[in-house]
């Protein structure tokens, strides 16, 4: 006997729709890197075309760096030193500091522009860090000689994974080789390098400070990173010249944007 139709079950399945007539074609990127100017255009397009504001991109960027830092740190007892600038790179750094602190890490933020009156998103992210009670100190007070070294470093590694992790969020794509790092920042990057030599692991946000995002040329006191977390696509300067030497392992994160975002958003760019 034929079973009566169930009036509550749709005639066409909404759980298993019919396959599309056209076969699926995987999206492929055309662009392999971004210049400084293309990165700025991409940030603008994300807001105007996809309605994804810079705050969301910044949050995703900070989360990406946080995930790398957790792998490098090895344990929550590993000290994390976050160097923050005054631009969007610094905003990413403040997000990262907040997320790491919320996950139980001991975080110190080193302000590379003490006394500067922050505005916009960077101010917002910085205030969130202050509200949590995270220590913010002038970067000139960072003392790399106090980091673990020698036998003591070996002991620390057994207990906490690494002696410490340094996050470089001082300057991003805005640095141009034609304008050398000011002496104030050179002093800070020199301290970071001393810490690196003493066993600290260094993560650069988007591009190491002192590396030109377009040419790969680098300041004499540019930061040397073990890993660089770059966003959307690698910056052109990471793939050539000294930029390739200083960037370490390059990790690319889409920060919440479609995989072909750069191609579609910048299709009118030269």
Question: Where is each model-derived feature located?
Answer:
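Generic structural hydrophobic/aromatic packing signal, biased to beta-strands
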Residues: 39, 100, 109, 229, ...
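YjeF_N-associated NAD(P)HX repair module
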Residues: 2-34, 163-270
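Nucleotide and nucleotide-moiety/phosphate-recognizing core
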Residues: 66-172, 180-205
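Short, surface-exposed, charged/polar-biased interaction segments
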Residues: 60, 67, 86, 249-250, ...
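Generic secondary-structure boundary signal with a strong preference for alpha-helix termini
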Residues: 63, 74, 97-99, 218, ...
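Conserved active-site and cofactor/substrate-binding residues in soluble primary-metabolism enzymes
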Residues: 30, 34-37, 52-64, 88-91, ...
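An N-terminal, well-structured beta->alpha segment
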Residues: 2-81
